[in-house]
């Protein structure tokens, strides 16, 4: 044990005693001397001991034994001040208190605080066995104080040198080229901290804060400002590029509508709207007309190739693969052929644009093995899905459209519905509607017209107005009927007149002309049913009998001609009668229509019967 104590305190443990009881001080000094603890100073108050420790003639002291009641009377925490500032452990001495020595109020609270935060407490009188282990307590506390002080210095340096006790302290961290200094303004309402970073060379560290430190302080903020400015400029550049990518306006090549209508427009290759250097291989048909060369030529328009023949015809071929294809152009007309192996085939799908006034249908060449001019052989290729319009949703056509589709000749004025004697009407519809959308009750120009809400087997008119034909927006697509002609039931038409005894059919000539129409009508015709409906719509004075309106399921009461004489006399006076002279129907009851209630069960209930039942 002595060897361990000597290793920590080779000159012995040097102790200061603070107590106003002289007898207790002498007794404590004798006990400590036996344990080889040297008592170097004694003081009666804590303030006197603190002044002695802070003076110039201070002696080396390694531990302080202080009566806790003297600390209470001093009014400050003696242990905290000495241990934090002088790094000397303080051990409190606690004596048995008499009634007159008891404290109360704030002193009692302060005493409890001192005892709770004390490093070590020893009761008086001193026990030699307890005091023999005192050197261990002192050695451990000295080590803790050294470590705590170093930790506090490092923490203050990391936080920028902030010190709670003194605002004007300067903490210098021994690191190369960096000095931290905190300046706090006490004048004014708000206190602001100013951090200055001084860059000092190793060669000028001992020369003071003269010219070297000032020059570094002046140059460093400029460097920091340049660094921040460059980062901000890079940040702005990145965001500007991102905004430009998001807000990039659509160019002409991005529009699917332009890509679809460019083949139908006569634009020179130098037009900026047309993309040069198209993708894929060139059209084999164009190569064949050019001389049969198999070398790939650059495309002026990426979706089609256009070539004029010697006879004034134009062939426009669409091709998405490299297989050879050539179409023979009909005489004095223009043919558009499609070639895409991924599309569904359509039998004999030909779109013809007539540049002349005739309305004859264009037919595809029947022979598949014929040779064109320049020894170009026409080859078979998969039939193509046909689109009506520039957008993909306007196709494919329904089964009733698997026929030749022709364009009408130009008309001088928009006609909603026109019909000649013995011919079916021609209906003109607006362009831009999908194929599967049918108009009901409205025509191309907003007026009431024919009903086109029929099924595939019924009449259907597909809009294709505004098609380019000599720069005139004309034409509509019509489908011939696919089934037998229909006829409507002959209506009973009754008109007032003299000498007429039976009903007259106003639409007999039109109906007969429709029924006698051939089974294979010419193009640009609709079904007979639609024509008959159109003929009936133009009539204004059409009347039906009550039996035709009610139908055969109604059970009418037996009619009695009880008022025939009166009705005949009234008819002679008025110039005619519907029941007497014209042979019309007779009403067998004298009740008004307001006296009859028509129920959902198709029965007639009279008001008199209802009143009697009630």
From Swiss-Prot:
- Keyword Hydrolase (UniProt): no
Q: Where is the composition biased (Gly residues)?
A: 205-217
Q: Where are the transmembrane segments?
A: none
Residue positions of the PTM 4-aspartylphosphate?
A: 67
Return the annotated region ranges for Disordered.
193-220
Domain Response regulatory per the UniProt entry, residue ranges:
14-139
PROSITE patterns recorded: RESPONSE_REGULATORY
Which domain of life does the UniProt lineage start with?
A: Eukaryota
Record's keyword annotation contains Phosphoprotein:
yes
Per UniProt, the keywords (alphabetical) are:
Activator, Cytokinin signaling pathway, Phosphoprotein, Two-component regulatory system
For biological process, the GO terms are: cytokinin-activated signaling pathway; phosphorelay signal transduction system
How does it get modified post-translation?
A: Two-component system major event consists of a His-to-Asp phosphorelay between a sensor histidine kinase (HK) and a response regulator (RR). In plants, the His-to-Asp phosphorelay involves an additional intermediate named Histidine-containing phosphotransfer protein (HPt). This multistep phosphorelay consists of a His-Asp-His-Asp sequential transfer of a phosphate group between first a His and an Asp of the HK protein, followed by the transfer to a conserved His of the HPt protein and finally the transfer to an Asp in the receiver domain of the RR protein.
Q: Which GO terms describe its cellular component?
A: nucleus
Please report which protein family the annotation says this sequence is part of: Belongs to the ARR family. Type-B subfamily.
Please give the PANTHER family that the UniProt record associates with this protein: TWO-COMPONENT RESPONSE REGULATOR, TWO-COMPONENT RESPONSE REGULATOR ARR14
Question: According to its UniProt entry, what is the function of this protein?
Answer: Functions as a response regulator involved in His-to-Asp phosphorelay signal transduction system. Phosphorylation of the Asp residue in the receiver domain activates the ability of the protein to promote the transcription of target genes. May directly activate some type-A response regulators in response to cytokinins.
Designated name of the protein: Two-component response regulator ORR33
Query: Which species is this record about?
Result: Oryza sativa subsp. indica (Rice)
